[in-house]
Amino acid sequence: MMAAASPTRAGQAAETQALEYLQGQGLQLLARNWRCKGGELDLVMLDADTVVFVEVRYRLHAGFGGALDSIDGRKQKRLVLAATLFLQKEAHWGNYPCRFDVVALQGSHHAGRPLQWLKNAFEC
């Protein structure tokens, strides 16, 4: 009998699926799991001339709210802080327009699970 995937492994698999999907849509990866004192950015990508900060959310069940529902005001503030620090450290991206997207995956960890890509998920 196989053990269930750990939340960390499930999250990494969701990030990989999101990355592959977004690259298939023409986005280019700038950074993955970029960490700073203010938090972490799952994916930082370039969409034409726009820097995109992508939060990947995975939920097995919607019992406590779905993946999209898990981006509350506190989480948004942490993402904005991390994005600000990224743009300060990676100053060459500082003059590019930017946006915050969310990729939400819900359901079993098998390939082909439904993926939702919400562009401009919130304003800062």
Swiss-Prot record:
Stored InterPro entries: Restrct_endonuc-II-like, tRNA_endonuc-like_dom_sf, UPF0102_YraN-like
GO MF terms, alphabetically ordered: nucleic acid binding
Superkingdom, natural source: Bacteria
NCBIfam families hit by this protein: PRK12497.1-3, YraN family protein
Family: Belongs to the UPF0102 family.
Stated name of the protein: UPF0102 protein PP_1324
